[in-house]
A protein has these predicted regions:
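PLP-dependent amino-acid enzyme catalytic core
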Residues: 1-125
Length: 125
């Protein structure tokens, strides 16, 4: 599939890009004369957790441990699950997220938007 965009009057030919292609391409910000930080909040999932989840899935695929259509189950209370659901959606995996029932509605909605099935548990379950 070929997509054309126009920037400043010029056509830009795009290859099909994946969300995970943008993980890790985060800027350095200067904190002081000798200190810099990576701005991980610029990752597509909004957190540093995008990096390890991408690496884990890349490694599992490379070693033929998972393939599209498989189901991945993760116990999480937040950013790892969001990153997993986001990347799994683009790669064709099903995701089940086990999370505390008291997590924010925003997180639950975001996970569902990426197609994750939520399994909510109460404290002590």
């Amino acid at each position: 599939m070929e997509t054309k965009r126009i920037f400043n009057g010029k056509h830009d030919e795009l290859e099909s890009r994946l969300v995970s292609d943008f993980i890790g391409n985060t800027p350095f910000v200067r904190l002081s004369e000798k200190s810099y930080a990576k701005l991980e909040s610029v990752n597509p999932g909004g957190s540093i957790k995008d990096r390890p989840v991408k690496w884990i899935l890349d490694d599992a695929e490379h070693n033929n441990l998972i393939r599209p259509g498989d189901t991945i189950v993760e116990a999480t209370s937040g950013n790892t699950g969001i990153a997993l659901a986001m990347i799994a959606a683009e790669r064709g995996y099903k995701v089940k997220i086990v999370m505390p029932s008291d997590m924010s509605e925003e997180r639950k909605v975001l996970l569902k938007m990426f197609g994750a099935e939520l399994i909510e548990v109460d404290e002590g379950d």
